[in-house]
UniProtKB/Swiss-Prot annotation:
Residues 1-713 are annotated as: DNA-binding and helicase activity, interacts with RecC. PROSITE patterns: UVRD_HELICASE_ATP_BIND, UVRD_HELICASE_CTER. Mg(2+) binds at H838, D975, D989. It comes from Mycobacterium tuberculosis (strain ATCC 25618 / H37Rv). This is RecBCD enzyme subunit RecB. In the RecBCD complex, RecB has a slow 3'-5' helicase, an exonuclease activity and loads RecA onto ssDNA, RecD has a fast 5'-3' helicase activity, while RecC stimulates the ATPase and processivity of the RecB helicase and contributes to recognition of the Chi site. HAMAP family: RecB.
Amino acid sequence: MDRFELLGPLPREGTTTVLEASAGTGKTFALAGLVTRYLAETAATLDEMLLITFNRAASRELRERVRGQIVEAVGALQGDAPPSGELVEHLLRGSDAERAQKRSRLRDALANFDAATIATTHEFCGSVLKSLGVAGDNAADVELKESLTDLVTEIVDDRYLANFGRQETDPELTYAEALALALAVVDDPCAQLRPPDPEPGSKAAVRLRFAAEVLEELERRKGRLRAQGFNDLLIRLATALEAADSPARDRMRERWRIVLVDEFQDTDPMQWRVLERAFSRHSALILIGDPKQAIYGFRGGDIHTYLKAAGTADARYTLGVNWRSDRALVESLQTVLRDATLGHADIVVRGTDAHHAGHRLASAPRPAPFRLRVVKRHTLGYDGTAHVPIEALRRHIPDDLAADVAALLASGATFAGRPVVAADIAVIVEHHKDARACRNALAEAGIPAIYTGDTDVFASQAAKDWLCLLEAFDAPQRSGLVRAAACTMFFGETAESLAAEGDALTDRVAGTLREWADHARHRGVAAVFQAAQLAGMGRRVLSQRGGERDLTDLAHIAQLLHEAAHRERLGLPGLRDWLRRQAKAGAGPPEHNRRLDSDAAAVQIMTVFVAKGLQFPIVYLPFAFNRNVRSDDILLYHDDGTRCLYIGGKDGGAQRRTVEGLNRVEAAHDNLRLTYVALTRAQSQVVAWWAPTFDEVNGGLSRLLRGRRPGQSQVPDRCTPRVTDEQAWAVFAQWEAAGGPSVEESVIGARSSLEKPVPVPGFEVRHFHRRIDTTWRRTSYSDLVRGSEAVTVTSEPAAGGRADEVEIAVVAAPGSGADLTSPLAALPSGASFGSLVHAVLETADPAAPDLAAELEAQVRRHAPWWTVDVDHAQLAPELARALLPMHDTPLGPAAAALTLRQIGVRDRLRELDFEMPLAGGDLRGRSPDVSLADVGELLASHLPGDDPLSPYADRLGSAGLGDQPLRGYLAGSIDVVLRLPGQRYLVVDYKTNHLGDTAADYGFERLTEAMLHSDYPLQALLYVVVLHRFLRWRQRDYAPARHLGGVLYLFVRGMCGAATPVTAGHPAGVFTWNPPTALVVALSDLLDRGRLQS
């Protein structure tokens, strides 16, 4: 396989290219480089590129790296910075005109960087389905749930009771088995369930029937709850792409000409089906992955899918330079790994060249780049070929590791010229008990160490204390619950203090519980945590041993409870039950993993799965030689390339034994790849152990070193058992002679003292010389208007109710005309009521067959979140009736005389959130000052004198408002954008301002005064510029004069239905304004001025 040359010919459209990486060979750099070259050298734009990776952290990193590479290239092409590598030097080649074109293309890419689709597979599928609408078979109001565990648990509870609740004998399936079975089949929709035809009445038949019932009921409940999981996104998109004339496929191919997929070795059959159907033989499809690091089979990753896809590629290359590790370490590891097959003939470790020629670890007591410490039997009192118990080794090896780390830290060793510290060291394991043993040994040696992967946070003491608190909230009159809560970390009482103070203490705690429960009901769970902190919980917990750990867990649980309360709209009893279910469910999603309790420099202890993608100067592998092989109830395996999940239980006879054999082989292959990942995390040194345990015959490191000899590529699934210490040492010595690991006997010596006299440095005052740019801010229309009264520096726009509405607008004269009563005359006004109306109009479907029922349902859905002074039972029907006429009110000439009811969901973009860079918003360096006064000058120069809003130019030039700077970012949300026939787009803003109780109070003149009084012209201008920017990269052949239709401000109280009075073409309640196209373009350029000149 040839090596990939980043500066070679770019992959062409209509081809599939596979780039096979190895550990440390710079996949992300290659991806960023390819994107930069496509942008600079071809006519491709960022919105035509799709970059997919497999988790959010990788997506964020990829976005930052791509943008950083483009910024670096722009700097070099502008002459601001020297070329920093071969890629930039390549881009600098060519004539002045060619360089200018590259610079222009890359600057355009930076200016429109938000157009780039850099996302996880599920984010990408979700956005595609949302944009496809009906073509993607995706309802607009379906809620995406990150985890279906709670729903599956509810279904298991119901089905288990229905199937086994009345049995007099023990059921064939325990509840724990039923829950594990259900979660396994739901989480792996690509797998076929086996055995296919179990004997009727057998345990296997019961298990398969139960799994089928769970899957069927899950689909039914998801439909009823309007919910879907991540796997549903993939399945629905794959289904939408299935037909030969699929409109989804046409749209995806039309939008994305270049598709790059990172971490492709972790794909699954459904993900590849989507990519293949959408882009194969049409787009330039580039798949980047390392099959040697395919370790996520238990999460759905399928190496067979990778191999199948790679086998159909038009071109395959390898990345051949290791940018991570020193040459000495690369060569030593290559001695062991080169040409080794890791579970498949096509998964081969290929040779790489090291970028770092020297050895960055200097003055270490044992400097060999790859060390193997061998535990001989006599060290622990064994001899011959006896197996050393793993429990004995869980004491010896961690102690040996701690002594080795202590010697290294005390030696004065340096890495890359600086002293080695504890944070430079990682200990990588596969099992939690091994991690805990190493953490305890390091702690006893006085070496700080952190391990976050030992438990789910819901298994912590903090979770138990939160549950105890929530139970007491529900019944503060029950002394038993109150006294239990008193003994939690929230109060810190003890059995002694409870006995001494008795009822007085119980009454005091009960009073606090009532107060905190009231906080929780009105302000959320976070308010309870804050109240506990103010009461001294933090100081008390931190004063105890392990206090940092406990306080971190308490805060973590508080955050998860707060999110669950908002996401699922749970009250205190619901939160109590939710927390109880989480604790019962066991291991959950990544956000349930315990967080770091300290950011101090410490040895990092982690599992291989956590370590993947990371690097450390020194890596210790204490138990990579050992692997216990077990047979679970549920087995994953492949049958002739088909992914299968055996759920028939352990009593399956010959068929079960065959499946167990297939599963063991795949597990052995996975373990080899885990060992490869662990060995390749180090930059300068790897230290591993070997010992003669019963299970060392299965361990990845044992099979690599003891199961083969130098020069052999095939790695056995199992080593020859029962070798003597001398036989094992002889094999290891052969590897050392060939350039492999340096072999050492594992004997624990005296620990080195970590305490060394440290010279006390002199102290001097540090002076702050930089100038803080106080005009740079993240602002909004509302903040700009409020800022005219008092200018303050804020980090975020203010949140809350509808800040852009006033209860009563001051107008000069009463309205005249038809005395038609407003449909909302009897309803209240105010920001809370306005927020409720906006929420209803945002989510209601105007094309619903029964619009009144639809509006009433939406009012009921949103009313609990907004306090409105109307009887709760009457609010929904009254407000629904009041909002119905506005949907039949003509919108005037600007909207082609249509009504809101006639403009369906497919022609609406509701709640268009934006974050728009202003002058100096996203590039460093000083940019020209722009203020609202400059906007006023533009308004004055572009608006004719008879424009109803022309007087607003003077308002923008006034002191206070005109002085407001426009530097940083403008954030906000447009209520709705309507698409009219002919591809014209209207910005629409709903207003509930109270101007009077009849339609006459909402005539055009009155609305004009209200607009000017409330500074709405500024909002309208900014929102039209946002739409202009949006259409510029989303509308084909965009032309502002053709596509921009202006703005509609809908004062809903004046919209009385088909009978709404119309004066000079202006329906009551409808304010129409179409700012000149030249003004919109000029304002967009003005706001962008600083960025364009940077």
